């Protein structure tokens, strides 16, 4: 039997993406309006903060899950990184395109870290990355965030063009979710 997961997120897109990546697991949102501050120095730090927060507010028999993710652009020295959500507020695509205007090195990667804290305080850390580059202009209607400008390695279209079916299998979050599923006890 798969463990039940309580996911500390208010982001419906992330919740649905995790559910699609782990179809056999019972995944529910924590359902709180007072998230902890994301003041960690790394994606793992922030994911752990959220997982521990969820653990403190969840039923005793579930795994509490926190996730942090973002995009790192090589030409921006890895920024926005852990500050992706704040950096991208409003118009993430426009801000990224403006930041890389005239820049030839458009290498970037999506990063996702998921931390799960079990009923006894045991911890599982799962990571997923998706390397690629930032396109010169936006294309596509599916996805969210930077998907309209992110072209994965080996592909010629943005994630927003490739679509949800592609993303369900190949995204940084899907990769981290699979690593989590492999690491959790059954």
Regions found by a protein language model. Give the residues of each.
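Anionic-ligand binding patches
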Residues: 2-6, 12-186
């Amino acid at each position: 039997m798969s463990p039940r997961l309580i996911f500390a997120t208010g982001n419906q897109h992330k919740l649905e993406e995790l559910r699609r990546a782990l179809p056999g697991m019972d995944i529910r949102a924590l359902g709180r309006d007072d998230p902890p501050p994301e003041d960690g120095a790394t994606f793992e730090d922030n994911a752990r903060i959220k997982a521990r927060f969820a653990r403190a507010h969840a039923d005793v028999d579930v795994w509490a899950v926190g996730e942090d993710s973002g995009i790192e652009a090589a030409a921006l020295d890895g920024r926005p990184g852990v500050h992706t959500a704040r950096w991208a507020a409003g118009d993430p695509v426009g801000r990224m395109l403006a930041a890389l205007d005239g820049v030839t090195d458009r290498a970037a990667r999506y990063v996702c870290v998921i931390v799960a804290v079990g009923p006894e305080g045991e911890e599982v850390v799962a990571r997923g990355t998706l390397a690629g580059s930032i396109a010169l202009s936006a294309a596509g209607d599916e996805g969210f965030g930077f998907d309209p400008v992110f072209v994965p390695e080996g592909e010629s279209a943005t994630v927003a063009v490739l679509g949800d079916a592609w993303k369900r299998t190949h995204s940084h979050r899907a990769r981290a979710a699979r690593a989590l599923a492999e690491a959790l006890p059954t």
